[in-house]
């Protein structure tokens, strides 16, 4: 009998948002298990509500973070040790047993997923990569010279299992690998059933305070990357006024540094940004970021044209350690081919100030430090 059961693995709130959307669209006729990991701390809190929806046959919790950290950059004998006795390791990590699956959907090529590829090493089980922000569009994770784990017999096994990747905008892909890019259906903002389902899972509450200018933080501090993003936040706060400026913290950053520095009040929810776009009227707010793909999801996921200010021309530092040049191509391609009329990329801090004022920022003189902000160095993402 043909096995039609699938497994979806989620490591972040954005992945969970997309996994629920996939289950109600392209996977509607298939029985599915959901595996929620501890990569993002808040994810486990959604498990009771996920179970109550009955959307998935089984909701499994996996403690994969520590194991991933141990083996992500490992080599040789250490990797041999990690991939030995995969069945025992999986029983130790997961609170429920896995079933037999025809397809496994995942977003990250972490050691855990690579171990699953070894566990389900048979032609009848396909591994399918799905959207996880710009990294899915620009990084060839399986290139042999990218990481030692790709050259390991077990760690590289997943290369034989993956043939395609599901993206909201396949034509944006620039990875340079041989995977087939296929389209995920965009989310229909008029789909009330999906909206109610996601609101229940994430316990979404309508913001009580104004969210006129929202800065989407990125995971630079979690990855140890030195940048000027906090200085850029301060510039934006001065341009629009503290009461109208809010920073959405990145869930992987260990501390809410912008809040600690007084750059923002507390962000009101841990639900994915996409759920705010789904529920509210984002046409009346402005999204600001260095280059977070979340700022592009209004266009990529929903087909909307929301005020968006991208600060990557003012940014100091590297966003990606190895694929920064490809990321620049991705951002240029998005701007040329996909961006709407309300998409802005300021070249100078003075242009940034003018754009924010045009979009409704305050018109009184700003703090002097704005005008004396140092020029961006040659390391900027151009």
Please provide the spans of the model-predicted regions.
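Short loop/turn segments at strand-loop or loop-helix junctions that form parts
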Residues: 60-69, 108-110, 127-134, 210-221, ...
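Donor nucleotide-activated moiety binding/catalytic core segment of transferases
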Residues: 251-296, 300-301
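Leloir-type glycosyltransferase catalytic cores
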Residues: 320-382
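Active-site regions of enzymes building and remodeling cell-envelope glycoconjugates
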Residues: 48-62, 124-126, 144-148, 245, ...
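A nucleotide-sugar donor-handling region in carbohydrate enzymes
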Residues: 131-214
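Conserved catalytic-core segment of nucleotide-activated headgroup transferases in glycan assembly
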Residues: 199-202, 208-253
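Active-site and donor-binding regions of nucleotide-sugar-utilizing enzymes
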Residues: 7-153, 295
């Amino acid at each position: 009998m043909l096995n039609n059961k699938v497994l979806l693995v989620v490591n972040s709130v954005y992945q969970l948002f997309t996994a629920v959307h996939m289950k109600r669209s392209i996977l509607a006729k298939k029985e599915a298990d959901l595996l929620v990991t501890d990569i993002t701390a808040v994810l486990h809190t959604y498990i009771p509500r996920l179970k109550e929806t009955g959307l998935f046959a089984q909701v499994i919790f996996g403690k994969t973070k520590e194991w991933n950290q141990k083996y992500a950059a490992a080599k040789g004998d250490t990797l041999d040790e990690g991939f030995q006795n995969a069945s025992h390791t999986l029983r130790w990590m997961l609170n429920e047993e896995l079933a037999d699956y025809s397809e496994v959907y995942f977003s990250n090529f972490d050691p855990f997923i690579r171990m699953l590829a070894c566990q389900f090493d048979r032609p009848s089980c396909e591994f399918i990569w799905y959207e996880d922000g710009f990294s899915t569009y620009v990084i060839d994770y399986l290139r042999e010279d990218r990481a030692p784990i790709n050259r390991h017999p077990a760690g590289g096994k997943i290369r034989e299992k993956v043939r395609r990747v599901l993206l909201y905008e396949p034509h944006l892909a620039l990875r340079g690998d041989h995977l087939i890019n296929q389209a995920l259906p965009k989310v229909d903002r008029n789909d009330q059933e999906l909206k109610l389902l996601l609101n229940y899972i994430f316990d979404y509450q309508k913001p009580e305070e104004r969210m006129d200018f929202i800065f989407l933080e990125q995971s630079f501090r979690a990855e140890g990357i030195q940048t000027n993003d906090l200085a850029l936040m301060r510039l934006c706060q001065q341009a629009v006024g503290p009461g109208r400026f809010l920073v959405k913290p990145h869930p992987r950053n260990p501390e809410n540094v912008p809040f600690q520095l007084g750059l923002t009040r507390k962000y009101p929810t841990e639900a994915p940004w996409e759920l705010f776009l789904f529920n509210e009227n984002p046409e009346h707010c402005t999204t600001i970021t260095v280059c977070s793909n979340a700022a592009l999801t209004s266009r990529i996921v929903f087909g909307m044209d929301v005020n968006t200010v991208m600060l990557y021309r003012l940014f100091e530092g590297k966003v990606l350690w190895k694929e920064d040049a490809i990321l620049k191509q991705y951002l240029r391609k998005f701007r040329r081919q996909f961006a709407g009329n309300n998409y802005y990329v300021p070249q100078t801090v003075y242009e940034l100030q003018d754009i924010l004022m045009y979009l409704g920022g305050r018109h009184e003189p700003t703090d002097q430090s704005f005008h004396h902000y140092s020029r961006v160095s040659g390391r900027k993402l151009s």
